[in-house]
Amino acid sequence: MITKLQAWSAGAIEMALLLAAAAVPVFVNFYGFHVFDLGKNAVVVSLALAVAVIGLVALIEGAGSGSLLGLTRALRRPLVAAAGLLALTTALATATSITPRLSLLGSQERAQGLVALLAVLALFGAAAWLARDEARRGRIVGMLLAGSVPVALYAVTQALGLEVVPGKVESASRVFGTIANPIFLGAYLMLLWPLALARVWQAVRDDRPVLFAGYAAVALLQLAALLLAGSRGPLFGLVAGLVVLVMAGGLASGRHGVAWGALGLVVAGAIFLALFNVPNSPLAPLRGAPVIGRFGRISETSSGSEAARLRIWRSVGRLLAGRPARLATGHGPEALKYALIPYAETYVAGRGQAGRLVDRSHNVLLDALAMTGILGALALLSVYGAWLWSAAVAAGLAPTAPDRRRLAMLLAAGTGLGASSWLAAPLYAGALTLLGLVAGLIVYFAWALVAGASRPSDAPADSQESSTDATRRLALALLAVGAAAVVEAAFGIQTVVTQVVFWMLAGVVVAVGAGDRIAAAVSDRAPAGVPRQRSRRSREHAAEPEPGGVTITWSAGGAALGMVAGAVLGLIVNDFVLYGTGLLADTLTVVVLLGLAALAAGWLVATDVGESRVAFLIVALIVFGLYVTLRVATWVAAQDASWVYAATVLWLVALVPVGGWWLRGAAAPNAPLGQGAVGILYPLLAIPAGVLVWVLAIQPVRADIYFQSAGANFDAAVKTDDATLFNVAEELFGRATRLNPREDVYYLLWGERYTRVGTAAADVTVAAPAFDKAQKMVAQAETLDPLMPYHTFNRGHLQLLFAQKLEAGSKQSIDAAANAAVALQQVFDKVPYDPQVANELALAKLVAGDSQGAIKLLEYSREQLDARNGQTYRLLGQAYYATDQTDKALEALQKAVAPGTSLAKQERFQVQLMLAEIARERGDLDTAIDHYEQLLAGGAGDWRILFNLGLVYRDKGNFEKSLAALSQTLQAAPDDASVRAQIQQALDSVLAKQGRGAIPGGGGGLP
């Protein structure tokens, strides 16, 4: 007999799935240093732990009703087995990782360790179990779509230039919504668009104009945001998914002409793309057009993102070839940036990446090979292949055993053919292997078209496929999603949000392939609020009022959907209405728009699945009000954003058991509460789960919030010279490091702040303590992460900065520079491809007096690393000038400021100043004057430039301009007696020249 606890478990797990579907994409933590994936993953892990604990309860409660037998049968399904294989290979890679802790917990930037994978696999298992029930499946897919609405709408507001929160953005030209990056936003929406189309088509079939209008609006909004993101990988994936959808739909419905047309479009599209990339083709003018123009630059592999991606792929290829012993298990999840360092090339893993070292190869298969080895890569391919096979079978495209074998063989053959490119074109093999998998699917469709076989509309009675038209249409959409995901994986990166969507939909694929349950495995009847044994269409109309009257209905399912919508409304407020930060002009407008859109999307889903819209709306507003009250109370009590975050996550977890009550399956009236004495142990399961939520999800993000707040206070203290703010910053930094003591980046960035303080100090005695503090911070970062050579680089860098603060040529300065050179040489030995490290080492040699060593190193950097690096030419000019090689110095300095080189404004000033000095020494006074005047016009306010300009005008005989420049110098010069005496001497010499002709006068110029 089904116990009441077992029935509740199913509802609670569904509630966790609905929250993950709708809340994770919209959640943003602007309080933290890592705004996006760290906080999102914390929510996923928290909900997944709830799923795991409640699932264990359900398994124990159902031990006597065949649950274990059902679990055994589920493991035999291809996609479930592939997911299990992926978990095992990832666990093995983590156990043998070069960075075990990082591989287990994930990085702060990506949050994609073993824990994150197990979390999304828990959601996968839950979806596979529950989505066999049509009502539950409808709610899960519906909330995935509803969750995309505020995300896509926020992206549109970004395109309109509406500012909601202050701070930096990932992309100023392309939208990114709440998903961190335009590429990631595009991939997320790509996964959902075929499902939106399926709902639109279902509304047409059911003659439901309200649903048609609603889902059409959702699809258009998603498409608009996807196009505004402008990322080619997701667009390629979407096109591939649509081609598969049309071909499969044509086959499934017997409209072979439609399928042939889709195949023809594939050929035409390939021809168009080829012509679009031919230089000087008639299509060339289109390359300047928005969105589509980027597809005309695919062949430009010498610059832009194409060149960067190919550099990464080459580097990963060298890594795989250079460490064959690691091919079995890989280097560990999240370990690519460490493994890649010895095998990278210029501007791949170099310091020039400014702290964002390449940690992904922009190809999911290459990531798997490098991080989880061949076993992990095979597991990944098996997941993709099993998805396509299972969805095609569920859609009725392979109804017989021979068809299924043929489909499996063609999928394997396409993958194998793509993989064979490792022998002929290894640079593109990762992409071609994935594309080959989809090609195998299309070849199967082509075979079916040539064979002329019409797919039967009804599956055999003993098959595992769904027997309803609506379910088959969903299977077709899921097949398109799978194809899109595989194509995008050839060029993209996995993220927290895309992983959540991918694995939840993978669970739906398993459920659809298994067929709808006549009697739910956890229930004697349908879930609460959904009438049993009613058709989808009749259920959809159940909530509509009868003609001539108004009927107010209540359903538990509608209330549960309202809870999810209320949670999303609360998160929108949490995202953009920040304590301690004033509202921008557009904040409230955007928040209201997003809230209304989220509410409308939830209402649409409630209408679609036949739940009460009244219950939905009432509960949504109540839950929203309760959360706002909780948030305000937490802030008033703690005055601490980290506790607001903690309260938010715990609030989401607390909604799970409450929603489970509304979504519970039915038990017999006389059913027991539980299985007896074993139920006493259930509350004990919550203790380790709660500890894990606190340790894995809440504490790291609280630390991140404290660190961000510490940085803001530190910067404000430096700007205002406020000792109180400085003490607050130090106290907050201490909290951050106590909560997350293993995060080396905190120490690194704190050291960089002290380095800036020391560099800006006017006096060495003030600078020395700051540099000493910075040295300690960087040393701690080195201790925590000894595999990262750029911590050593930062140690050498700050030593060099301190050397430059000391008196030039002094023993102390030379010794400090020599120490810096030792550290920088250690780094350069590990990354000889990095121009910035080479330049920094060369500068250390220059300051230490080793000009010839600096020249040799800089010439190597120019000839072997980057022939257009402005820093290299600037330092070469300085080194040549120091060794009296004036002609070479002049040539190098001119190249340093040539078009196409990148130098900071202050560095360009330094180059122009050296060019002016060289021209002056050579007697080319006009050129010297031009350089000095350009410096002054560009904003260089150094009094020494005015002084030297005055002397050049004097030497040229332009005494009026000389007097003007020297008079301004006297006003701008520091209050130093010797300096002012030298300026006055120069003025006297000009006055003497005006009165008596050529009279020897002072003023030799200041360097």
Question: What spans do the regions from the language model cover?
Answer:
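Hydrophobic alpha-helical transmembrane segments in integral membrane proteins
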Residues: L275-A289, N574-Y579, V632-S642, L663-T720, ...
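Helix-start (N-cap) detector for alpha-helical repeat units in TPR-like alpha-solenoids
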Residues: G233, A703, D744-V745, P789-Y790, ...
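Soluble catalytic regions of membrane-associated enzymes that act on cell-envelope
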Residues: A321, W694-T883, Q894
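TPR/TPR-like (Sel1-like) alpha-helical repeat modules
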Residues: Q894-P899, R954, F959-A977
